[in-house]
Amino acid sequence: MGETEQRPTAGSRLGAQENAGISTLEHGQKPPLTPPGKLISIKIQMLDDTQETFEVPQRAPGKVLHDAVCNHLNLVEGDYFGLEFPDHKKMMVWLDLLKPVMKQIRRPKHVVVKFVVKFFPPDHAQLQEELTRYLFALQVKQDLAQGRLTCNDTSTALLISHIVQSEIGDFDETIDREHLAKNKYIPQQEALEDKIMEFHRKHTGQTPAESDFQLLEIARRLEMYGIRLHPAKDREGTKINLAVANTGILVFQGHTKINAFNWAKVRKLSFKRKRFLIKLRPDVNSSFQDTLEFLMASRDFCKSFWKICVEHHAFFRLFEEPKPKPKPVLFSRGSSFRFSGRTQKQVLDYVKEGGHKKVQFERKHSKIRSIRSLTAQPSEQHAEVPKQSFQSSSFAYGDDSDAAAVQSCQQGKELKASTEDTGQHKSPSLKKSPKEGRKVDGAVVSAVEEEEEAATDRMQQNRPQSQQPSTAGSLTGSPHLSELSINSQGGPSVANMSLSPNLSPDAKQSSPLISPLLNDPSCIRTEEEEEVKKKRFPTEKAYFIAKEVATTERTYLKDLEVITSWFQSAVSKEDCMPETLKNLIFSNFEPLHKFHTGFLKEIEQRLALWEGRSNAHIKGGHQRIGDVMLKNIQGMKQLTIHLWKHNEILTELENGIKNSRKLETFCRDFELQKVCYLPLNTFLLRPLHRLMHYKQIMERLCKHYPPNHVDFRDSRAALAEITEMMAQLHGNMIKMENFQKLHELKKDLIGIDNLVIPGREFIRLGSLSKLSGKGLQQRMFFLFNDILLYTSRGLTASNQFKVHGHLPLYGMTIEDSEEEWGVPHCLTLRGQQQSIIVAASTRAEIDKWIEDIQMAIDLAEKSSDPVPELLASSPPDNKSPDETTVDQESEDDLSASRTSLERQSPHRGNTTVHVCWHRNTSVSMIDFSIAVENQLSGNLLRKFKNSNGWQKLWVVFTNFCMFFYKSHQDNHPLASLPLLGYSLTIPSESENIHKDYVFKLHFKSHVYYFRAESEYTFERWMEVIRSATSSALRTRALSHREPHTY
């Protein structure tokens, strides 16, 4: 008998070895028996556009077919993929892994099932297998061709250039043109061919695996990456598109994202006929709940989208597959659906624990001409990815009419699954089909693997094209406060850049880094590297003081560039600013930027000599910094004329904004750019604040040196020079700080006129509860030297705070009301026309308010100036002076439902006002003054939550917030962590950190560990962070700074 010729399988075409299958059953369990019955042939279209035929029993569940395809491809991380097919109504649906195949695919002979990517992780570095990344790259290629992945021409050309590099290797103009002529990656490709080849020329030496990685790195930053749009209408009948992603449910208008609902804020998903319903969790301090409603084309279409949402939530948010609920004995109401398969957490854990063997494979396009690929071994560079934090939340699914809503697994429940390898024996489950396909006559054990974890919000920031995973967070996309709070806005994010609760406009919780931190493998330091680091650099305190000058100077230069480069460039493109104002701003900032560029260069050269990186033979004479500081501080005195102009610049810019709607819109839009990570007018104060930092550094250096030290004389002279400069400019700086703060608060408030008037000074802002007819209601209070405002956070597109009322301080009295009203930490503020009752969250908080309000009352008594009309539309107040009834106020603005078209707030969500609202705390002007003094920049290592890896980040601490960058060269932060409300401690022995110079940040359930490089830097980080995490006492503030004259 002649032997039957063996056709290559889909896996062998990719070069994969036959896989016996990997068992993921618990110990003692047996694989399910394959249901008997007639075999049916199913045609599967692979991602490389080839077709394979599989034969499965009619009654076999969908999981048997899915596992057969994964085994056929030798695909370990098969859980990211799914089988998609058109149902009897020609609607594309996913194969249900629990239902019999025949009940879903009713006419298998006439249906082609597509094997495609179903779950797109926030960061492709979480994909451990090169084969998996290759299949993801094929999906990107397919989405480009089909018009699903939309982007600008430059991004499109860059994506295609990496595909071409992966397929044919290094650039050759003739071969490139021939290849592009034969292969159409997008419609109308001809217009981009020159740009594609221009990018391809830069990829010389890049292996196919690296090209795949870079392709996914670029693709994941695109807004439409992994997005499948589902047409719908909102309550007003406006046509929109819904989509689901790893972060939550997204709303699009066309191809533009206009809103997003993070999983952490979604309480329940359901559908009722054609209506898709999203029930949001209420805010912490309010009882109302939002329910958003969308109308879809049909009940089947609506149910299909609901099932996809359930699967995405379970895969990305749960720790383990949800357990099936017992079926009701008599009646069942509504639809029920359960996610079947491994969650991403389980996939990550399995791969991390080494529950698979690396598979070498060859690609469909193997004729490549890469310099490196001729000798390179199969890429293992992305084999391990450090863990990020992973969170789950209680979440209900169900038809709105059913009582059996499926609850998610308990938050925080860790899976400890024992996985057993079945060995390398040949699996009997896959046999050759007479129709040149594969048939299944035995149970196929799913080749499900797990990869390590980090469900991070995808970040839309630009990053260097390297292996950069995405909070915080929050970290997020847009900076949403995710608590490191590293998103939302958004945060990243985030990746899990979200390290803590999001303080986004919608309070979308992910975690507190605003946008996701990166889990780049290249960020992890080994112990050997640490030892080299310790041996290489000096250890004396003076060196680290000098290094602090350099690190903070880098940040100061970046802040200057926001004005001299980014703002100036934007202004030049828009005709919105008078020439006189342009000249005033840039003629006084450009000399500063030029001077400090040279200053930084000198400092870095001195540090290089000190460290022995150059001219080591003369190193001994350069272990000092005082002479460099003295020379440059004397040079700064020549620039004092420009510093005096900054008060005028700030005033004229705000006047211009007040008088020109066009300039106001321009500045507001500029503040939304990622590079403008603080309010615009804050950058105008940076030069004066920098002088104060020089003074502090020189004081620290002089205190460290003994009088006979070679550097002491120059250091003391430099301190005298900078002290003289500060004395001249200090009064001007105090006025500018108050003026800037009033204008910043003005942007956060609506319903108020004349907030900024001569003589008015800001004292404190914060969250208090106000007693009204509906009970205690959270309100935001703003205390000035003549008036007290109370507001609520509105649901407007700008996310501002709406003013409800104001109390003049003249004649006001404060009464303790805890016993009268039975509310802890409660007091009555009794004004001449109105009285209100307020309560704080803690005794310390109410004491700070009492102290500051009493001080403000005393100041108001001394002033004879009347309080001007503040509210834009003040209703008549008929209350008598002695009336003590609780003030009634409308809650309509709080309970108004939002529509799907309400864009995520263009207003920055991580301002101090919003952080205080979410953290239920307060800050004073003295706290702001202390924050100005306590600014720091430098490298820190952040510990990954569930591994021993440490990630190196460039961190800038300013304005009560840590901003995280990949390196000091980045133009904008990737994530942020507001620290108000956090506690700062040193890890205990039980936390098993086992490293020096580690500090711990903790807020509720959010914990982060950071590690400094030396004892000095550790103490400095502890000092500056403690200024934000600790309540600022007035006595401490006055010891640091001259009292503010109100």
UniProtKB/Swiss-Prot annotation:
Q: Which domain of life is it from?
A: Eukaryota
Q: Which residues form the DH domain?
A: 541-732
Acidic residues compositional bias: what residue ranges?
884-894
PROSITE patterns, per the entry: DH_2, FERM_1, FERM_3, PH_DOMAIN
Map out region (Disordered) in residue numbers.
Answer: 374-522, 864-907
Q: Which GO terms describe its biological process?
A: dendrite morphogenesis; synapse assembly
Is Membrane one of the keywords? yes
- This protein's record includes keyword Cytoplasm: yes
The segment(s) forming the FERM domain are: 40-320
Q: Keywords assigned by UniProt?
A: Cell membrane, Cell projection, Cytoplasm, Developmental protein, Guanine-nucleotide releasing factor, Membrane, Repeat, Synapse, Synaptosome
> Compositional bias (Polar residues) at which positions?
458-513
The protein's matches in Pfam families, at most eight in alphabetical order, are given as:
FA, FERM_C, FERM_M, FERM_N, PH, RhoGEF, SOS1_NGEF_PH
The cross-references to Gene3D superfamilies, in alphabetical order and at most eight, read: 1.20.80.10, Dbl homology (DH) domain, Phosphatidylinositol 3-kinase Catalytic Subunit, Chain A, domain 1, Pleckstrin-homology domain (PH domain)/Phosphotyrosine-binding domain (PTB)
Main location, first listed in the record: membrane
Q: What induces it?
A: Up-regulated by retinol.
Matching InterPro entries, A to Z? Band_41_domain (IPR019749), DBL_dom_sf (IPR035899), DH_dom (IPR000219), Ez/rad/moesin-like (IPR000798), FA (IPR014847), FARP1/FARP2/FRMD7_FERM_C (IPR041788), FERM/acyl-CoA-bd_prot_sf (IPR014352), FERM_2 (IPR035963)
Mind naming one GO cellular-component term on file for this protein? dendritic spine
Comp. bias intervals (Basic and acidic residues): 413-424
Membrane topology summary: Peripheral membrane protein
Domain remarks in the Swiss-Prot or TrEMBL record: Intramolecular interaction between the DH domain and the PH domains can stabilize the protein in an autoinhibited conformation.
> What is the protein's known function?
Functions as a guanine nucleotide exchange factor for RAC1. Plays a role in semaphorin signaling via its interaction with PLXNA4. Plays a role in the assembly and disassembly of dendritic filopodia, the formation of dendritic spines, regulation of dendrite length and ultimately the formation of synapses.
What does the subunit section of this Swiss-Prot or TrEMBL entry state? Interacts with PLXNA4.
Q: What is this protein called?
A: FERM, ARHGEF and pleckstrin domain-containing protein 1
- Annotated source species: Gallus gallus (Chicken)
Species lineage: Eukaryota, Metazoa, Chordata, Craniata, Vertebrata
Name of the encoding gene: FARP1
